Amino acid sequence: MKNQTMKSHTMKNRLTPSHQIDLGSGDGRIVREAALRLYQATGVELNWPLVLYSRLTCSRLNCIHRPKFLRTDLLRHSLSTYDVVVIFGVKSLMKPLQAKLAAELHPDACVVACRYRLPDWRHVDQIIEGVDSVWLYRPPAAAAAAARTGGAARAWS
């Protein structure tokens, strides 16, 4: 798990988000790291003890943008205001989640998927190492436009 977190951070170092969400935030380590880097960060998790643990752990941080942890269904939470979406989901969730991402994300947004790929999206970058694999995506409409113009996304450097 620690190896997965490090790979996700490596991928995110290629991004310059202003507002990040971690879907399936678990113990909150990705959200904490984002908050320490001065990003606005939100974690969404169904497991109430993990939400409480994350809130307690982050309450000790001295961050400009205090991280938020929400106990809610990630398929019901609006993603329209986020620049970067981090997903540590289960395989069966990836297909319904990609439809939600396509419908709600703005064109400059980025998606970092950990462990499981989005089945119908084309990744723009990847770190492949077995179960610790990470993929970087852009919403399909934005990726198609960039391919036509040869442009790069504004959301990463």
Task: For each feature predicted by the language model, list its residue ranges.
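Conserved class I S-adenosyl-L-methionine
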Residues: H19-G26
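Conserved SAM-binding loop of SAM-dependent methyltransferases across substrates and taxa
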Residues: D27-Y39
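Conserved SAM-binding motif I beta-strand of class I
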Residues: Q40-E45
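Conserved short alpha-helix immediately C-terminal to the canonical SAM/SAH-binding motif I
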Residues: W48-L50
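A short SAM/SAH-binding and catalytic strip from SAM-dependent methyltransferases
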Residues: S80-P96
